[in-house]
Amino acid sequence: MPSPASNTWINTTLPSSCSSPFKDLASTSSSPTTLLPFKKRSSSNTNTITCSLQTLHYPKQYQPTSTSTTTTPTPIKPTTTTTTTTPHRETKPLSDTKQPFPQKWNFLQKAAATGLDMVETALVSHESKHPLPKTADPKVQIAGNFAPVPEHAADQALPVVGKIPKCIDGVYVRNGANPLYEPVAGHHFFDGDGMVHAVKFTNGAASYACRFTETQRLAQEKSLGRPVFPKAIGELHGHSGIARLLLFYARSLFQLVDGSHGMGVANAGLVYFNNHLLAMSEDDLPYHVRITSNGDLTTVGRYDFNGQLNSTMIAHPKLDPVNGDLHALSYDVVQKPYLKYFRFSADGVKSPDVEIPLKEPTMMHDFAITENFVVVPDQQVVFKLTEMITGGSPVVYDKNKTSRFGILDKNAKDANAMRWIDAPECFCFHLWNAWEEPETDEIVVIGSCMTPADSIFNECDESLKSVLSEIRLNLRTGKSTRRPIISDAEQVNLEAGMVNRNKLGRKTQFAYLALAEPWPKVSGFAKVDLFSGEVQKYMYGEEKFGGEPLFLPNGEEEGDGYILAFVHDEKEWKSELQIVNAQNLKLEASIKLPSRVPYGFHGTFIHSKDLRKQA
C-alpha cells in the first residue's frame, strides 16, 4: 500500500449488508473490493476516515483533468478478504510539494482561511459525536457500485459480444453523481459532482469515456484541494447545517470562495438542444459539454443561452418532438417567485418568464407537457428552511398540504389562466408522459407515485413503494382520478425510464422503466403496456444491476427501437453496456467497458448527424 501522501486509489472491502433503506447498496453475495478515486483534502491532519472493515486513504492533491491517453485501472474482482491491491494509476502522481494557500490571497485572507478552517475542524469534531442518518451517511450512500470512479479518456474498439445494430450511430451519454473529494461530513448520493459517461458508436464499433463536468464549484474546490461548498442534502440539516451555511458565507465575505457564478453540481439530467449537450441539476444553470471527435468529453462552461437565462433550470426540461421547442421550469427555495416557467424556440430564443404563484417553495424535480399544455405538479414535499433551527431537515413532507397539478398553456404570457386540480396523496418524483383526450376533456398523466414521499431525502421506517399510475385531470369538472396501471399481483417498484421521446406529449402505449428492486438497485427493466397493464420484464442477470433504460427509437412505429443500459456485474466487478431489442426483449449486443460505471441518473442519445452540427 502506498503511503497516504501518494496519489493512490482507495481500496476498501465493503460490508455485505446494511440495515437501512439503502441496505442493498452493498453486494448481497460477497464483499467486492472497490476502487474509489476520492481525492484527499489538502490538510496536515491525518487523511483517513474509518469504515467498518478498513481504513480509506486519500491522495493529498488533485490531478488536473487531461484529455490525453490514460492508463486504465485493472478492474478488481470481488473478494471476501481485506487484501489491498494497488491498481494502475490513471495519471502521473503530483509532487507532495503544495502551496498552503493560493498565491493570490493577501495576509488577511490567509489569516481568515486559517481561522475558518479551525472552525470547520471543530464543527466536524462535534458532528462526529452524533450518528448520521442513513440518508446522509457516506458509508451507506456511496458504497458498492454507488461509489465514484476516476476519469477515463476515450478508449477505442471495445470488445463486443453480439452485434451492434447498424441504426445505432452516435453517442449514448449518461449523467451521474461522482464526488471528487472525501466527504468531510454528511453526504447524500445526489450531492456528488457531475460525471458524464459516454459510449460512441461508429460503424459497428464502440468507444467509452467518462469525465467530470467542470462546474464553477468543482473548479474552485480543485484550486483549494478540498471540498468547501455546502452539500444541499447531506449537510444542510439541523444546527450543523446552519453552521455550515454561516461558514460558507464567512468564506465568501473574505473572497476565499465565490458562489456568485453558480454552486450546482450538474449531475442529474442531459439534453441535446440547439446543437448543445447540456448537463443539468436543478440548483444552477446548465453546463455545456462537448463531445470530441474520438468520443471524449470536454466542458465548455456554464451555459446561459447567450445571456438569456439568469436563473436555475430543473434537470428535466421537455423537448417537444414536433416543433423542437424546449420547455423548462426554475424554482427558488428562498425568495419569491418560487416557481417560473419558460421555453426556448428550436433556434434557442427564450420566452419571457411566467411566474407561477406558490405559497411556499416546493420540490419540483419534474413536470410534463402535452400537445398544448404544460402540466406542473405542486406536491407535498416542500422546503422549510426554518426546520433547521429546530434540528430538522429543510426538505419536509407536509401532510397538511393537498397535492395538485397545474395546467398552463404552453404559450401563456402569465399564469392568470392556469388551472389547478387537486390530486390528494400523490407524489411523483418523475412524470413519464402526459397527453390530451379531448373526447372526455381530460389530461392523462403517467407517473410513478412514491410513498413515503420524502423517503429519498429523510430516513423512514416504512419501505419505499413506487407505483406506476395513470392520473386523469378533468378540465370540465376540476376533479382528478388515479389508478395503478399494473395489477396488485404484478406490482413492482418502477422508477427511472421513459416513453418513446418522439411521441412525448402525445398518447403513448408503452413505457420502459427501471425495476427498482431490491431498492435502491435496479435489477432490470419493464416494458409496460399503459393501456392493458401488461408487464414484460427484462432482467440483467444474476448479481447484475443497472439504472435508467434508454429507449432509442428506430422508425415510425412506437415500439420499434432498442434499449440501452449500463449494467454492472457485482460478482465479477465489471461493467458493460447492454443493447436490447425493445420489441422482443432479446439481448442484441453487450459492450465490455474498460472501467467500472457507477449507478447513476439520466441520459440521452445524440445521433451522428446531429453531432456534426455540435456547437
Curated annotation (Swiss-Prot):
Its cofactor is Fe(2+). Induction: By drought stress. Belongs to the carotenoid oxygenase family. It comes from the Eukaryota. Disulfide bonds: none annotated. It is an enzyme of class 1 (oxidoreductase). The gene is NCED1. Residues 20-45, 62-101 are annotated as: Disordered. This is 9-cis-epoxycarotenoid dioxygenase NCED1, chloroplastic. One of its GO terms (biological process) is abscisic acid biosynthetic process. Overexpression of NCED1 results in increased accumulation of abscisic acid and resistance to water stress. One of its GO terms (molecular function) is metal ion binding. GO terms for cellular component: chloroplast stroma; chloroplast thylakoid membrane. Residues 1-41 form a transit peptide. Residues 571-592 form a coiled coil. InterPro entries: Carotenoid_Oase (IPR004294). Has a 11,12(11',12') 9-cis epoxycarotenoid cleavage activity. Catalyzes the first step of abscisic-acid biosynthesis from carotenoids, in response to water stress. Active on 9-cis-violaxanthin and 9'-cis-neoxanthin, but not on the all-trans isomers of violaxanthin and neoxanthin. Residues 27-37, 64-86 have a biased composition (Low complexity). It comes from Phaseolus vulgaris. Fe cation binds at residues 316, 365, 430, 602. Its EC number is 1.13.11.51.
